[in-house]
Amino acid sequence: MAASGFLLIASFMLVLLVLARPLGSFLARLIEGDPFMPLQKIEAGLWRCSGVKNVEMNGWQYALAILLFNILGIALLFALLMMQGALPLNPENMPGMSWHLALNTAVSFVTNTNWQAYSGENTLSYLSQMAGLTVQNFLSAATGIAVAFALIRAFSRHSAATLGNAWVDLVRITLYVLLPIALIIALIFVSQGVLQNLDGYLHITTLEGVKQTLPMGPVASQEAIKMLGTNGGGFFGANSAHPFENPTAFSNFVQMLAIFLIPCALCFAFGQVVGDTRQGHALIWAMSLIFVVAVVVVMYAELAGNPHLIKLGADSNINMEGKESRFGILATSMYAVVTTAASCGAVNAMHDSFTALGGMVPMWLMQIGEVVFGGVGSGLYGMLLFVLLTVFIAGLMIGRTPEYLGKKIDVFDMKMTALAILVTPAVVLLGTALALCTDAGRAGILNPGAHGFSEVLYALSSAANNNGSAFAGLSVNTPFYNLLLAAAMFLGRFGVILPVLAIASSLVAKKRQPAGNGTLPTSGPLFIGLLVGTVLLVGALTFIPALALGPVAEHLQVWLTH
């Protein structure tokens, strides 16, 4: 079993790196503004129709464009979800959502969180799935990548005032990257048996004589961008555990690759654009080290399972509860780590049924900011925030002004870095405290004790870090949780994006200093170790007290009573 686990990890990383390197080179061309000749005429037509001028923006113009674009997206999606009962492509006559669920869902999909307090097959029309959620899956992914593009340009340019054009970046990312790759992935999914139709639901009689309804729908097209854009919102309530979304072991492997593909490619692109490929390789090494250890820990925890099962007459104590037998323990454990290391949130098993230790690792990966490859765009700029913090700490230790890639890191940069790193932990911990201190919050807890606390902590961690997965034992489709989690998702998304763009605006104006004898090398093993240590230390200091009350306490309860 151990050999199979390591073979799965090794094969996944090998295929990922082989695919990500050429994509990284293409992304580097987009960042540097190289024209893509076959689509230049389409671009020009889009600029004319939309009235967009292809001129560069400064940091605040870029931030304002991104913010207004996403707020408009929330408003339009909210209206669509409220009115879906009166709109076409609704063969099952689904009514409009309640206002608080519609608001939660709109904020969720626009912020790339895809938190779902509903089951899609029982709640949404095909129009809402296609024109609402799928469109935002593309646009929210493009938003994250565009912010990463702006930050990369800030490091590669010097003595400049602009970061690119937000509208141009959004269009090019969608047209040149997301749409073509999503089309290829969708065709792979269809070949594996994922649904893609606009038929009404099938009403059948099983061999046992029981009536059953089989949901239909355009699943593959949404599933592709759901994974590629690290969105994670399922067409069905069971998400990628549903055989109509993820039918085979091969489709499961492709889904994991799709989640990490763009985040890994952006690291390669970063190294190429700044003129030192070793910088991108260092980020990949740091991310990979944390990722591999996390996968091994979850595999071990789920294979160790629950020692009380043998006493109760089970054949084995391995934890297969909530898992699909077509995937097994190893692939399920790895999927859980992939989806929470990235800001995806898709699940092929029920995380609420994991062991205490197996469930704690995905929760912790979200809590450290999802910087282990992370979401499309957000993973890279999140890790670069930790790079700046690491450089600052190293500068304090040797008594030098911190610098990274020849750019001096000043007080303003560190204030914005600290703000971006601390905003999501603050939202998570304050939101959890609010939920536990109010009757409305406690009413949603179905499992009392340490696990109930873990469910609330997981929900806020998932929302604030724009992940979207859940410990599903928490009843969240209430006005209290819909509004609380909507606020957490919005603050977690734009409370990081705005400081990141402020940092980019500051860095792009600075001169690049030549490396000297006292310059800290940022591409070697020493810096990689220091970076990993900084990520772990910040995560430990922030969340260990909360984790001790939840999954750690639950783990001790299980094993100390054995």
UniProtKB/Swiss-Prot annotation:
It is found in: Cell inner membrane. It is a multi-pass membrane protein. The chain crosses the membrane at residues 6-26, 63-83, 132-152, 175-195, 253-273, 283-303, 327-347, 356-376, 379-399, 416-436, 483-503, 526-546. Keywords: Cell inner membrane, Cell membrane, Ion transport, Membrane, Potassium, Potassium transport, Transmembrane, Transmembrane helix, Transport. The keyword Kinase does not apply. Pfam families: KdpA. It comes from the Bacteria. Disulfide bonds: none annotated. One of its GO terms (cellular component) is plasma membrane. Belongs to the KdpA family. Part of the high-affinity ATP-driven potassium transport (or Kdp) system, which catalyzes the hydrolysis of ATP coupled with the electrogenic transport of potassium into the cytoplasm. This subunit binds the periplasmic potassium ions and delivers the ions to the membrane domain of KdpB through an intramembrane tunnel. The system is composed of three essential subunits: KdpA, KdpB and KdpC. HAMAP family: KdpA. This is Potassium-transporting ATPase potassium-binding subunit. It comes from Yersinia enterocolitica serotype O:8 / biotype 1B (strain NCTC 13174 / 8081). The lineage of its organism: Bacteria, Pseudomonadati, Pseudomonadota, Gammaproteobacteria, Enterobacterales.
